[in-house]
Amino acid sequence: MPIRPLSVLTALLHVYIALRLLPALASLTPAWPLALVLLAVSAVTMPLPFVSRSHRADRKAKPAGETLHWIGLISMGWFSSLFVLTLVRDLGLLLAWLANALGGLQVPWDKVGPWSALAVLALATGVSLIGFVNARRTAGVKQVDVPIRGLPAALAGFTIAQLSDIHVGPTIRNGYIQR
């Protein structure tokens, strides 16, 4: 998908998140503009890793570009958690509204809305931090002996190395693999 339509789509999804969470947060905390700023930064920086793909040779000469690349990738991770959790919150609120409308549940909307919005932000941020820490830690090495019957003598002692779930790219490079 070309970058411009993708950028517009992700910006619109950020607007959706803002419309669903910020009004509820405004009734809970005066710090809600911080969430608005973070959403705006996320919307603006998410396209950066795709734009900078064509400028890989310049990265060593431009550390600011590398930093923006990282910010964009971190924004993507945070946005994905935030978007999914916002959808889950909306589904939960819809089910609570239906239960309330049918008379089976008394919902304290003045508490449920704001606190669930805050929970979405807190969970998305926490999950993103955990994901970032796990992605940056050194991958574990596990040695496994696999006996193979009928292996030719020429292959005795042969070692096979398998790298699993290590995605070498703009954030995980050769130095990480060498650790």
Task: Please identify what each model-predicted range represents.
Residues 1-139:
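Non-catalytic terminal accessory segments
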Residues 136-143, 147-179:
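Membrane-embedded segments
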